[in-house]
């Protein structure tokens, strides 16, 4: 990570045991059945992980959102009129295979249990990837997941509309089976209390842009940002494990874009996944994703077996 002196200046550093103490009797509202539904492929997250890591985090976020709501009341009093309600936007960034989606789903399930903000929506940025035909036209198919492969204008228009209090905003849905947007399906967002936005590049700013530093970025609309972190050696091994599991699930689907991978043996599948990581996911991590890590308000650090072993919280 960053050097120790800079890290100490920017972050409060908690090991797992110290962080777990900050739960402060927040009740566990998820069952093992709930967790089975929420966890992703190749995730071994347990209820103890929820208790030790996610309950303290949900408590922190509840306090922060409450403070924002109080600030809104102060602003209304100062202006002499009620401003439109604006959702609190939480972004979750990190590498492919780090478990961002599982983190986002668990946080959504926990945050909606608090009576102060029961409506919590989750949107992934996958739906804002350019359609396959457009990626092929632009020569970006091998750069899918890199910043330039996203329809950034559509993404910014969406976040801006939600943040402005729009009554109804539609979001493109993405299918990992067909490896493309679903042309006739949309997710509808209707004035949530909290919006969780999960994706590879949601911490990016103009300093990182290969396109145009003058345009707004998703990070400009985010109130609290989380980065899920792990060593690249672990990330690559998790990606390969997930790829092997997909052979008998997603890849085996007759509509799968990657159906040709379903017949690979273990050696072939491992070699293929390793090549994909080395050619696409690894470079994207090092060039675009990891450099944004220290902009996050909170870093969740994973060790072996996907277990969080460290939490860094911005001072």
UniProtKB/Swiss-Prot annotation:
Protein name: Pantothenate kinase
Enzyme Commission no: 2.7.1.33
Catalytic activity: (R)-pantothenate + ATP = (R)-4'-phosphopantothenate + ADP + H(+)
Residues that hold ATP according to the record: 94-101
Pfam families with a match to the protein in the record: PRK (PF00485)
GO molecular function, one term: pantothenate kinase activity
Gene that encodes the chain: coaA
Pathway membership: Cofactor biosynthesis; coenzyme A biosynthesis; CoA from (R)-pantothenate: step 1/5
GO cellular component: cytoplasm
Disulfide bonds: none
UniProt keywords, alphabetically: ATP-binding, Coenzyme A biosynthesis, Cytoplasm, Kinase, Nucleotide-binding, Transferase
InterPro entries attached to this UniProt entry: P-loop_NTPase, PanK, PRK/URK
Protein family: Belongs to the prokaryotic pantothenate kinase family.
Gene Ontology terms: biological process: coenzyme A biosynthetic process
Compartment(s) of residence: Cytoplasm
Keyword Kinase (UniProt): yes
């Amino acid at each position: 990570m960053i050097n120790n002196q800079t890290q100490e200046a920017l972050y409060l550093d908690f090991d797992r045991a110290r962080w777990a103490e900050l739960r402060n009797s927040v009740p566990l509202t998820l069952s093992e059945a709930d967790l089975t539904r929420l966890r992703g492929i190749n995730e071994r997250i347990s209820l103890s992980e929820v208790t030790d890591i996610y309950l303290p985090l949900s408590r922190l976020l509840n306090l922060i959102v409450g403070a924002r709501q109080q600030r809104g009341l102060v602003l209304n009093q100062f202006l002499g009129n009620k401003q439109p309600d604006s959702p609190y936007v939480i972004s979750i960034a990190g590498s492919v295979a780090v478990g961002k989606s599982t983190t986002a789903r668990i946080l959504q399930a926990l945050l909606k249990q608090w009576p102060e903000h029961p409506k919590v929506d989750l949107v992934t940025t996958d739906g804002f990837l350019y359609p396959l035909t457009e990626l092929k036209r632009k020569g970006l198919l091998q750069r899918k997941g890199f910043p330039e492969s996203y329809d950034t204008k559509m993404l910014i228009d969406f976040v801006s509309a939600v943040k402005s209090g729009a009554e109804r905003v539609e979001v493109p849905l993405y299918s990992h089976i067909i490896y493309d947007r679903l042309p006739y399906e949309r997710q509808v967002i209707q004035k949530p209390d909290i919006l969780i936005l999960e994706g590879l590049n949601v911490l990016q700013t103009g300093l990182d842009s290969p396109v145009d530093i003058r345009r707004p970025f998703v990070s400009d609309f985010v109130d609290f940002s989380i980065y899920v972190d792990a060593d690249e050696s672990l990330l690559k091994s998790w990606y390969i494990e997930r790829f092997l599991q997909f052979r008998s699930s997603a890849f085996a689907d007759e509509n799968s874009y990657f159906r040709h991978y379903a017949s690979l043996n273990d050696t072939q599948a491992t070699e293929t996944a390793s090549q994909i990581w080395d050619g696409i996911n690894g470079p994207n991590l090092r060039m675009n994703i990891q450099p944004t890590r220290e902009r996050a308000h909170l870093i969740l650090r994973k060790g072996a077996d996907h277990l969080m072993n460290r939490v860094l919280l911005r001072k």
